[in-house]
Amino acid sequence: MKSESESHAQSQIDSLMAVIPAAGSGSRMQANIPKQFLMVANRTLLEYSIEAVLKDARVEQVFVAVSDSNAEYLIELKKSLPTKVHFVTGGNSRAESVLAGVKVAVSQGATHVLVHDAARPCLPKKALTAVINTGLKDPQGAILAIPVRDSLKRAVISVNDETGVTHIESSVDREALWQAQTPQVFNAERLQQAIEHMGALNPQLTDEASAMQWCGFQPALIPGSIRNLKVTHPEDFECVRDWLLADNNDHKN
């Protein structure tokens, strides 16, 4: 077991920086603006997500990967953000945007990176602290995730069904199945190499843990939260909007 002095020395060595991929269009939201720029109480979801990540003082800098097409949304946004938040040019895919941010973080001296979704604004501080604690000390990294609770069904894949109704092929055993969330925390250079090795355009690269798994790592699963919901569909936005408004009211009272 490490002594207190050894643990303190290790914390001095570690340099944690965050990467938030925010270059996506969010087409499934059926909104006229990218989902990360949807507003709740005069603030964007991206601002809430950045604020959530910065609740842990160990996060030294935040690199937000954005698209040039989002320039109009960034003009005012840049004025309201802390100086430790920086924008970098993202790519056409999530993985390309993450890779761009990780490369900048590494160039700035990051030993570890924390990757968080731009449209996951209700991250609890307790969960953030837990995943950072494990991610910094576990060489395989760590991610937030929640055990799958509902029954899972595999659908029959048929292109000849004229009714358009999808039918069940079989049930899937949910034992040992977890639903991945973010943040995901890894050694910075190791994650960069993993994404480059797997290929940023590989369709199987759905999150950072996928790249690490591709290279033989088994990241730790840290219990997340149902509130740590990613806005993907309109009903998701309704949920996080209500939570954020409730939190804002609590802070005012």
UniProtKB/Swiss-Prot annotation:
Keyword set, alphabetical order: Isoprene biosynthesis, Nucleotidyltransferase, Transferase
Reaction equations catalysed: 2-C-methyl-D-erythritol 4-phosphate + CTP + H(+) = 4-CDP-2-C-methyl-D-erythritol + diphosphate
Pfam families: IspD
Matching InterPro entries: IspD (IPR001228), IspD/TarI (IPR034683), IspD/TarI_cytidylyltransf_bact (IPR050088), ISPD_synthase_CS (IPR018294), Nucleotide-diphossugar_trans (IPR029044)
Site (Transition state stabilizer): 28, 35
A GO molecular-function annotation: 2-C-methyl-D-erythritol 4-phosphate cytidylyltransferase activity
Family: Belongs to the IspD/TarI cytidylyltransferase family. IspD subfamily.
Function: Catalyzes the formation of 4-diphosphocytidyl-2-C-methyl-D-erythritol from CTP and 2-C-methyl-D-erythritol 4-phosphate (MEP).
Protein name, as recorded: 2-C-methyl-D-erythritol 4-phosphate cytidylyltransferase
Gene name in the database record: ispD
